[in-house]
């Protein structure tokens, strides 16, 4: 349904139990129907599934995403004037196998508690909350242990040093000022480019680069 601005029918009854990829399924569309009953337990790729969709705001917090490895740009908006409005409770998602979360909430208005997410496998956080003016939740307990030099390959692609994988994470995230000073960032010796530029994040609340408190 990518680029289909008119489709908004009830498809809640679809059998999605064998689907492995929902890459851009509702991107650039106005789809906004309840699909909370979908079985997405085998879906590995949610890349930009709802990206650039400024209508979707349905409860999908009960989805079983335990097979997911790619959440890149899942709720990404287009720009500052066209942000996505998705703001449902997804705190219960099983993110233990996710490798990529880049741009997941970029240009979005998402502001829900995701502090208990298992981020221990995530290797790419680039621009995750960039230009999100709303997000200000406690994620100080996130496990960044996969952000190491030895994990530079993600799905066969080389994303370079760990520092590059956090570039612009909170860029222009104007509300964010949670304490993330406890993040273990041993392999990131200096602040990543544009990490929190134009955000509300104070120096005291930033990670202590090159350390593991």
Regions found by a protein language model. Give the residues of each.
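Negatively charged
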Residues: 1-213
């Amino acid at each position: 349904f990518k680029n289909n601005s008119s489709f908004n029918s009830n498809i809640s009854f679809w059998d999605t139990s064998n689907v492995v990829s929902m890459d851009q399924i509702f991107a650039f569309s106005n789809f906004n129907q309840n699909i909370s009953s979908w079985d997405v337990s085998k879906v590995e790729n949610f890349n930009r599934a709802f990206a650039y969709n400024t209508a979707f705001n349905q409860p999908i917090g009960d989805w079983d995403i335990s097979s997911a490895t790619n959440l890149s740009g899942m709720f990404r908006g287009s720009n500052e004037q066209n942000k996505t409005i998705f703001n449902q409770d997804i705190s219960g998602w099983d993110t233990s196998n996710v490798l990529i979360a880049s741009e997941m909430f970029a240009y979005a208005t998402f502001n829900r508690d995701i502090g208990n997410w298992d981020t221990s496998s995530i290797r790419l956080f680039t621009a995750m909350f960039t230009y999100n003016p709303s997000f200000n939740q406690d994620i100080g307990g996130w496990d960044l242990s996969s952000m190491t030099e030895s994990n530079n390959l993600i799905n066969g692609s080389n994303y370079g040093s760990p520092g590059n994988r956090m570039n612009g994470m909170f860029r222009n995230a104007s509300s964010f000022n949670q304490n993330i000073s406890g993040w273990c960032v041993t392999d990131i010796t200096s602040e990543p480019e544009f990490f929190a530029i134009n955000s509300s994040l104070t120096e005291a609340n930033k990670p202590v680069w090159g350390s593991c408190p």
